[in-house]
Amino acid sequence: MRSITYTLLVGMLACTCISQAEMRDWKDKQGRKIQAELVSCDGTTVSLKLRSGKTVPLPITKLCDEDQSFLNEQSSDIDSDNGDTGAGQLTPPNFAQPWPESIKTDENFEVKTIKEGPDQFIYESPHFKYISDAKLGLQLIRAMGRMFEATYDINKSLPIANKPTRDPQVKFPIFLFEKKSDYIAAGGPPDAAGVQITKGNDPTEPYGHVLVPFESLGVQKVGSGYRMDRAKDFHTLIHEVTHQLMGREVKQASWFTEGTAEYVGMTPYSNGRFALSNNRSSIVASVTAYGKGKENKGRALGKDINLPYSLEEFMNMDYASFTGNDGNTNYGIAPLLIYYFYHGDGTGDAAQIKAYIKALQKGTPEVEAQQLLLNKRTWAQLDDAISKFWRRAGITLKFAKKQVSQNE
């Protein structure tokens, strides 16, 4: 069932684009009134400007049903210039928002039981549906859901307009397995902590689903119930959930798809909080050594990295080659490129990669969209810029020179 909160969110975000705000009465669920005009909404809080000129914040869930309906009626078409279709279906893109320094998810989010037994147990948090083959308490679902909801929040907050996080009607399915053998039987890789699976154009799962064994969440059976190790390293699961939160139209290139997931997965996370302000050191540690976590999950490429392919070849590598014999290396190089385009290219405002993402969202082919990343540079010049950037962080990154055939 589509919740009124989601409907309100779409309406309010769309209302921020209205050219003329009007002074009107606003009422909360307790019947208290203020007269104000709508200023903006960040997705959780609406800003209202009082007659005095003071702007006050109000949680969107506190508004009365009448005001929620009013806001929904005010919703306008999503800006088609950003590649979105379906008026009112997606919240507006957030490309203009500042890069977040940290993300802390609300610990008081609602969890509820949808179905219990006999062989399937379904629970929900605000943005995820958990389908488990064993009964779990709501307290455990809340503890476990904190990581999933925080991953949703960071992907929504990155100013790259992740389309699935802007879809107010979706709950992302997470399948939980008490036994690792059942996880494998359902399609989970034996050596992976979890996996995201997309089933073609299945309308019931527009963004696929994630398979996770209990052990990857640090969930252990204790007596007749379960408990969770909150100190567990969730890098792989955060990586896979990030895949689920990326629109299909941007998943054309292996380097971008995997690099984006690794960028989020390598960002320091603890108890519902992502620290982005110092994630460069964490990414460097995860790529060059074994990371900063206690489980030693890093690529261990060292700080002198010589690659057998050119930058252009790497950024156009098919998925089979990307995950093949040099997979560990490729998974390490991809987040270095992502970090450069997010924070090191040009003035550090991510302008070129945002243009690239916008182009992909409009259906532009990958090779054509890459011209926006090049930004009138040759591949050699871009290679040099990336190498110089990482040299300042103590990493020597050397791509091979592209081999030009005699027929070219």
Short names for language-model regions:
Residues 1-5:
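Positively charged n-region of N-terminal signal peptides that target proteins for export
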Residues 6-16:
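Bacterial N-terminal signal peptides
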Residues 18-124, 129, 139-142, 146-150, ...:
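Compositionally biased alpha-helical segments
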Residues 23, 35-38, 64, 68, ...:
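Extracytoplasmic/secreted envelope proteins and their assembly/folding machinery
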Residues 46, 248, 269:
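Basic nucleic-acid-binding interfaces
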Residues 51, 177-181, 343-345:
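Short, flexible beta-strand-to-coil junctions
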Residues 118-253, 365-369:
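Juxtacatalytic substrate-recognition/specificity segment
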Residues 196-212, 232, 251-408:
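Acidic/His/Gly-enriched intrinsically disordered linker/tail segments
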